[in-house]
Amino acid sequence: MSRPSRLQRQVLSLYRELLRAGRGTPGAEARVRAEFRQHASLPRTDVLRIEYLYRRGRRQLQLLRSGHATAMGTFVRPRGPAEEPGDATAPGTRLDDGGAPKNSCEDTGARETRSDGR
């Protein structure tokens, strides 16, 4: 087996640091393990994605160490009865009766902001 690269050593170090930092925080260890397992199959050649995830992990480590974090978890959007796992519509949209995407803000009376901020 070849020697781990510098980036691999950094990722493993981050993993250990996150596990240590999350010891007293409910859900932290499970969240860290799940996140690392989810991305374990990334190809070694996808360096940009690995570096991005590494930087994101560093920021999460800073938050854990700051003492402001009381728990770690994930927000999962529950699937509605009409949604399929491979549904191509964007989050926050659903299909109207004609099959066209319908914005969920239309029913609530909330205004949808345009990309230019108006």
UniProtKB/Swiss-Prot annotation:
Keywords: Chaperone, Mitochondrion, Repeat. It is found in: Mitochondrion matrix. GO terms for biological process: mitochondrial respiratory chain complex II assembly. Residues 68-118 are annotated as: Disordered. A motif (LYR motif 1) lies at residues 14-16. GO terms for cellular component: mitochondrial matrix; mitochondrion; nucleoplasm. InterPro entries: Complex1_LYR_dom, Complex1_LYR_SDHAF1_LYRM8, SDHAF1. Coiled coil: none annotated. Residues 53-65 are annotated as: Interaction with SDHB. It comes from the Eukaryota. A motif (LYR motif 2) lies at residues 53-55. Its main location: mitochondrion. Plays an essential role in the assembly of succinate dehydrogenase (SDH), an enzyme complex (also referred to as respiratory complex II) that is a component of both the tricarboxylic acid (TCA) cycle and the mitochondrial electron transport chain, and which couples the oxidation of succinate to fumarate with the reduction of ubiquinone (coenzyme Q) to ubiquinol. Promotes maturation of the iron-sulfur protein subunit Sdhb of the SDH catalytic dimer, protecting it from the deleterious effects of oxidants. May act together with SDHAF3. Interacts with SDHB within an SDHA-SDHB subcomplex. Also interacts with the iron-sulfur transfer complex formed by HSC20, HSPA9 and ISCU through direct binding to HSC20. Binding of SDHAF1 to SDHB precedes and is necessary for recruitment of the iron-sulfur transfer complex by SDHAF1. Belongs to the complex I LYR family. SDHAF1 subfamily. This is Succinate dehydrogenase assembly factor 1, mitochondrial.
